[in-house]
From Swiss-Prot:
The modification N6-acetyllysine is found at K14, K156, K194, K238. This is Triosephosphate isomerase. One of its GO terms (molecular function) is triose-phosphate isomerase activity. The lineage of its organism: Eukaryota, Metazoa, Chordata, Craniata, Vertebrata. GO terms for biological process: gluconeogenesis; glyceraldehyde-3-phosphate biosynthetic process; glycerol catabolic process; glycolytic process; methylglyoxal biosynthetic process. It comes from Pongo abelii (Sumatran orangutan). Pathway: Carbohydrate degradation; glycolysis; D-glyceraldehyde 3-phosphate from glycerone phosphate: step 1/1; Carbohydrate biosynthesis; gluconeogenesis. SUPFAM superfamilies: Triosephosphate isomerase (TIM). One of its GO terms (cellular component) is cytosol. Pfam families: TIM. The modification N6-succinyllysine is found at K149, K156, K194. Its EC number is 5.3.1.1, 4.2.3.3.
Length: 249
């Protein structure tokens, strides 16, 4: 990892927890040592964004797990970047595979959300990744490059964007991409940014890995030169998330 890229660890709590259990988790995180050279962001369920921001130590930022592409309106069940900021959250996760595959979000919609969230001043954790059949068909690069292009077409300021590579076959399955598999895709993504955006953006943009990251797997993954951090699912609800936060130490 280049010295200029601050290690980034995101915890995606998904649709999990209640005030009591999340309060206990927050207590563990508040007591934890967060290295000065590591940025930590937690993404609670929408209902608990305000609760998390009030309870979490300021050293840990808060993200929403999704947002819509416009400011206000008749969009039942949706949340806008302005509302997310009003809660005190500063990031949003967009394009997660569960949004793509469970809720049918298209690349086009995700790109529109990215553009609006950035215009409203949020940082964006933009997710990309291939399914198992796509990896087995040898089209991993094609898939992730196409997804990245739609995101890139909607980004003016890359300093507010973190790219999260999440192979869909490794999310919640217990299967983790090997450090070599992760590094290979991250290196190719950085090459794509260099060729299609700029060398400066390629060098400065953090590309993080997600997919069954645990306290046991994080150190070797973190040692890869193009792995700049993690987006953690299930393990972010457990005390081992502290070990993952400290993976570079």
């Amino acid at each position: 990892m280049a010295p200029s890229r601050k290690f980034f660890v995101g915890g995606n709590w998904k649709m999990n927890g209640r005030k009591q259990s999340l309060g206990e988790l927050i207590g563990t995180l508040n007591a934890a040592k967060v290295p000065a050279d590591t940025e930590v962001v937690c993404a609670p369920p929408t209902a608990y964004i305000d609760f998390a921001r009030q309870k979490l130590d300021p050293k840990i930022a808060v993200a929403a797990q999704n947002c819509y592409k416009v400011t206000n309106g008749a969009f039942t069940g949706e949340i806008s970047p302005g509302m997310i900021k009003d809660y005190g959250a500063t990031w949003v996760v967009l394009g997660h595979s569960e949004r793509r595959h469970v809720f049918g979000e298209s690349d086009e919609l995700i790109g529109q959300k990215v553009a609006h969230a950035l215009a409203e001043g949020l940082g964006v954790i933009a997710c990309i990744g291939e399914k198992l059949d796509e990896r087995e068909a040898g089209i991993t690069e094609k898939v992730v490059f196409e997804q990245t292009k739609v995101i890139a077409d909607n980004v003016k300021d890359w300093s507010k964007v973190v790219l999260a590579y999440e192979p869909v076959w490794a999310i919640g399955t217990g299967k983790t991409a090997t450090p070599q598999q992760a590094q290979e895709v991250h290196e190719k993504l950085r090459g794509w940014l260099k060729s299609n955006v700029s060398d400066a953006v390629a060098q400065s943009t953090r590309i993080i890995y997600g997919g069954s990251v645990t306290g046991a797997t994080c150190k070797e993954l973190a040692s890869q030169p193009d792995v700049d951090g993690f987006l953690v699912g299930g393990a972010s609800l457990k005390p081992e998330f502290v070990d993952i936060i400290n993976a570079k130490q």
